[in-house]
Amino acid sequence: MVGVAPRIETRRARDCPACWDLSAPEKATQVVARPRMDEAPSPEECMAHAVASLQHSDLMSEIPTSDTFQALMTRYAPGYRRSRSDTFPLTDPTLTASQLVSQAAQADHWRRIVSMTKEYILTSVPHTEAPPASDVDTLLAWWHLRLVSLWKLHFFSNLQEEMQALWQVLESVRVYEGDDLRVLVDTPHVSFPMHVLRAQVLLQNDRRRGIQLLWKHMQRAKEASADSIWRARYIRVALLLSSLLVEMDALPAATSLADELASGLGSADAKLALVLCRLYLQMSDMASASRMLSRAKSAADPADAALHAAILNHETMTRFISEPHADHEKLVVDDLKDVDQALTNTMALDAFFHGHVLESIQILERLMHEHPTTFTTTRALAPNLLTLHSMGANHPQEEKQRVIRFLVQSAGDDPWFVDQRAG
């Protein structure tokens, strides 16, 4: 079964070599002095060229016909054939484009969003001789949404291909910024989140370069962190960078970042304290993890049931890691009204490890029926439930068929397309 993290591997710190100079200098921002007006293109011409360049259909790749959901169906229901409804954009003349996208995102229909963003990139901005600068902002916003959707679908090869193609445009097209002619990538048109996403994509093939860019973006956000928006950006990038450094066993650098975030914790930063708790657990720093857990408890709003569930989940993980071979009492959370998916999976694993397979099944079944969207879009839950049913004594094949039909129905497809031999 796929666990939330009842056991986190202890990592040994490696010497941080000199080549990990995360503050490596970047090349200077390209600023092209504005030449005489009889030689230079006009601002309107530059903007029109930028808009046209961002709307090239060649920048977008062909999307695969299968995704994570399809892979699950292929494994457990080989006769299943997905309907075409999820591969086309939603249409409703009463809703705006942003409302349609919001609906699709809430339902985790990222494939639909990919289809919609392609249409909007190609058609939402008309070709004119003097487009406003906001047209570039609009197109880049749709591009950002498209790239995030590809990430959500785990279409990483498509993501890398499209990001590379887009970045070539951003680094070659020039627009005016005041009296200077700059490459588009160095202007405010390219948002901070887009820069961070590009660094994350680079991590797939060039981890060192990706980390250096994340470090650069983190420092930029830190310098402006007096503003609440930039502080939130600084925290997000610092957490991302810390996690990557832990994965690389660069524990001194990861610890330094985590300690810096911990020292700046406010009285209401319960959620951040929990994230830091998890980071310290991954680094096997039990003392710091316990300290962050205590900070989260003291800062938590008693009325926030979801936060209470997350705290309980981290308490459980800390207990398992501290004493992995101890015979712990079973985890009981009957008083919680809202249980998040991570805690639910931990509860199911806890029951399973105590030999209570049927109780483990009941815990996951309850979440499946009460929160179907959460269940069908969380990767560990469905495989774990199907695995548990395989261990059950009462008609495992029929039970797995029932779960598969529920998953298909929740995805908006016809459940009777599932092969009767599945399971």
For each predicted feature, which ranges?
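Solenoidal tandem-repeat scaffolds enriched in leucines and small polar residues
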Residues: K216-A299
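Helix-rich alpha-solenoid scaffolding regions
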Residues: A130-R209
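Intrinsically disordered, low-complexity acidic/proline-rich regions
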Residues: M1-P93, I113
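Structured C-terminal portions of repeat-based eukaryotic scaffold domains
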Residues: A289-G423
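Single-residue signature of alpha-solenoid repeat helices
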Residues: I113, L159, G210, A254, ...
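Structural motif corresponding to the intra-repeat A-B loop/turn of tetratricopeptide repeats
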Residues: A107, L153, N205, M248, ...
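Flexible helix-coil transition and linker loops at the boundaries of alpha-helical arrays
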Residues: S124-D135, S172-H189, A221-A232, A262-S267, ...
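"A position-specific structural signal for the A-helix of alpha-solenoid helical repeats
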Residues: A97-Q103, L145-L147, K152, V190-V201, ...
